[in-house]
């Protein structure tokens, strides 16, 4: 290559560099403008929230001493206030916010807000794929430990994998909630309890008590993975249809339980879910009996019994509540028709 050609290429690169500098300068200015707008929006939302809270309290006091016509106006205002709060929730999904206690402990004060719908949906999609792949891996891991490798070291690897899986799920779910996902209630707490349970299983030392419960736990893990796979497969299809109809949010997630939106087309999963819930109760009863034996010296046995009982109560009562509410709504619809 001749020197003139090298100089020509350098001139071309230099021109592109100058253009890059100008573009980057504009980018920095826009970024500063964006940061200022975010601060203005966050401040305005906080101010609106405070105003609505005061108004809500005033309306509550007025309602006690008003006539029927005024009561209708107050009810209408209360409905609008509730709708406005939902709008604020959607707005905040695109604004930086302080992390909750859990994310602060794990990640520190890092901004985890994703600014575009595309980025939010991509992260949510990655979360769902992670759950699916790990469910399959855990199912094969439990099968291997139960039927092929009866060694403590393989059990420890499996239990460590469970701890890592549930820890990762809680972090990813917290990030999704910061970005507008409406997963809440027991289905958030469920993974924290599962993380604790897996951690206790990991610390349970080898011994007669462990061997007496080992096969039952691994069989339960296989069943749970199979049900979770079924749930992912059918819930993801159902969510896709509901999103296309505009009835569900883009960041709605598949869960390990039953929610009201699953009523159409997914009720066949209920027997599998209830069987899994009662298996958790059976695990709790088995462990309580083991903890009552004179030979039982490990604290993990009683702690696991309590944890399985908490999981059973949370899962069973939450699922039962959803089914009960849906049946009542259907009953009211029949009466109105």
UniProtKB/Swiss-Prot annotation:
One of its GO terms (biological process) is fat cell differentiation. GO terms for cellular component: membrane; nuclear inner membrane. Pfam families: TMEM120A-B. It is a multi-pass membrane protein. Keywords: Coiled coil, Membrane, Nucleus, Transmembrane, Transmembrane helix. It comes from the Eukaryota. The chain crosses the membrane at residues 100-122, 130-150, 157-175, 185-205, 268-288, 300-320. Residues 1-39 form a coiled coil. It is found in: Nucleus inner membrane. PANTHER family: TRANSMEMBRANE PROTEIN 120B, TRANSMEMBRANE PROTEIN INDUCED BY TUMOR NECROSIS FACTOR ALPHA. Necessary for efficient adipogenesis. Does not show ion channel activity. Belongs to the TMEM120 family. This is Transmembrane protein 120B. The lineage of its organism: Eukaryota, Metazoa, Chordata, Craniata, Vertebrata.
